[in-house]
Design a protein with these regions (language model features):
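Extracytoplasmic/periplasmic copper-protein system
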Residues: 121-155
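Short, solvent-exposed loop/turn segments enriched in Ser/Thr/Gly
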Residues: 30-35, 96-97, 110-112
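Sec/Tat signal peptide C-region and signal peptidase I cleavage site
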Residues: 14-18
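A surface/secretory-pathway sequence property marking extracellular, secreted
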Residues: 56-81, 130, 142-151
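Extracellular adhesion/glycan-binding regions together with long Ser/Thr-
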Residues: 76-93
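Low-complexity, intrinsically disordered segments enriched in Ser/Thr together with acidic residues
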Residues: 89-109
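Low-complexity, serine/threonine/proline/glycine-rich extracellular segments that form mucin-like
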Residues: 25-64
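Sec-dependent N-terminal signal peptides
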Residues: 4-13
C-alpha cells in the first residue's frame, strides 16, 4: 500500500511539471504581486530557448526579473502587453522560473496568462482556458477581493 501511494505521488508530481505553471494560486486584488512562471520541461526533448508571457487585462505595470544569460524584451503597444525572455538555454532535463512583478487591478476574478514556450524552431502555446482535458492550459491566478480596511497599494 505504501508503494502505491509513493508511485501515485511520483505520477502526480510528474504531471504537475508537465506544463508552464504559476508558483502561486491566488493573490489579493489591488496589490503588486511577484509571479514566477515555472517551466518544467522543454519541447519534445529540446531545450527551452524562449518564453513569452502575455499579460491579461487586470495585470499591468509588469517588471521582469533579470535572468543571467537571457535577453528581456517588453512589448507595450496599447492592448498588447508582453514580456519575453530569449537567447538562453534551459535543457529539457531541468526546470526553472521566469519571474516578474505585476500590479493587479482592484477587481477580483481569474487572470489567465497566455504563454509561448520556444525550443529552437519549435514552439508550444500554453493558452487553453477553462476546460476539463486541456493539453496546453494557460497558467491562471485567482485574484481575491481585498479585505475591508486593508490598503490596496502594497509593494
Amino acid at each position: 500500500m505504501k508503494k502505491c501511494f509513493t508511485l501515485l505521488a511520483l505520477v502526480c508530481a510528474t504531471a504537475a511539471q508537465a506544463h508552464v505553471t504559476l508558483d502561486t494560486a491566488s493573490a489579493t486584488a489591488g496589490t503588486y504581486q511577484k509571479l514566477a512562471f515555472r517551466v518544467g520541461h522543454g519541447c519534445d526533448g529540446k531545450a527551452t530557448t524562449g518564453l513569452t508571457v502575455t499579460l491579461p487585462e487586470g495585470a499591468s505595470h509588469a517588471k521582469p526579473m533579470p535572468k543571467a544569460g537571457w535577453n528581456i524584451a517588453i512589448t507595450d503597444s496599447g492592448a498588447l502587453h508582453e514580456i519575453s525572455w530569449k537567447g538562453g538555454a534551459l535543457p529539457d532535463a531541468y526546470f526553472d522560473e521566469f519571474v516578474m512583478q505585476v500590479k493587479l487591478s482592484g477587481e477580483p476574478g481569474k487572470l489567465y496568462f497566455r504563454i509561448v514556450q520556444e525550443c529552437g524552431k519549435v514552439s508550444v502555446a500554453w493558452d487553453e482556458i477553462a476546460g476539463e482535458k486541456m493539453k496546453a492550459p494557460a497558467p491562471v491566478l485567482d485574484v481575491l477581493p481585498a479585505p475591508a480596511g486593508v490598503p490596496q497599494h502594497v509593494h
